[in-house]
């Protein structure tokens, strides 16, 4: 197998920087511009920033993460030894990001990628009133809530989970549609949709009840219309150790207390 050129990126935390120093003393590293893959040291948040940086540069490489953060759901165990062999044996999982297209009440338009989720949030003490459409069909004429989000499998253990949304297997072709503190309809607790569906939101009474739209950490305020769908033009690749029990972690996360 041809030797792959590795680039190293690390979170600014002390643990990640110390690990990076250790790896630099053992292996040969290359700038991202000349690399074939990226080794990322940190937690899930740093992995998210690494993937967004590649989307911004329009140069997308496979990423092998090692956990030096807290949860590390998208990361492998930290081990400095035999890294090149681990990379050769790694299992690749494709993650499709979301694309959020929004229009504001003033007519401005924005298009923003999201890897974890797109969330709509009320901006004031007034509850949001939102019409929900799937593939152009109105499925909820009026959702009264603090907000609502669309999550990818990669993001389903993050904000989605804290909003009582379902955990989705990382390799599934599904999206979670999860309300945030819903008031009406009282019995609606969300939906699981095929990722081929296009999801749209119309903000009702957007002047009195302003809503912001957030794609991961990128916010657009005072929105009126939001369209969310999978972006198949920018697939991301995460690399995992063959023994990485991802399915087991997904299962056990649902019973965490």
UniProtKB/Swiss-Prot annotation:
- Name of the protein in its database record: NAD kinase
InterPro entries found in the cross-reference section? ATP-NAD_kinase_N, ATP-NAD_kinase_PpnK-typ_C, NAD/diacylglycerol_kinase_sf, NADK
**Cofactor(s) of this protein:** a divalent metal cation
Q: Where in the cell is it found?
A: Cytoplasm
Q: Which family does it belong to?
A: Belongs to the NAD kinase family.
What does the function comment of this entry state? Involved in the regulation of the intracellular balance of NAD and NADP, and is a key enzyme in the biosynthesis of NADP. Catalyzes specifically the phosphorylation on 2'-hydroxyl of the adenosine moiety of NAD to yield NADP.
**Cellular compartments per GO CC:** cytoplasm
Enumerate the Gene Ontology biological process terms: NAD metabolic process; NADP biosynthetic process
| GO terms, molecular function | ATP binding; metal ion binding; NAD binding; NAD+ kinase activity
Q: What is its EC number?
A: 2.7.1.23
Q: Which residues form the active site?
A: 44 (proton acceptor)
Key words, A-Z:
ATP-binding, Cytoplasm, Kinase, NAD, NADP, Nucleotide-binding, Transferase
- Chief site of localization: cytoplasm
Pfam families with a match to the protein in the record: NAD_kinase, NAD_kinase_C
PANTHER family for the chain: NAD KINASE
Q: Where does NAD(+) bind?
A: 44-45, 49, 116-117, 146, 154, 157-162
Q: What class of enzyme is it?
A: transferase
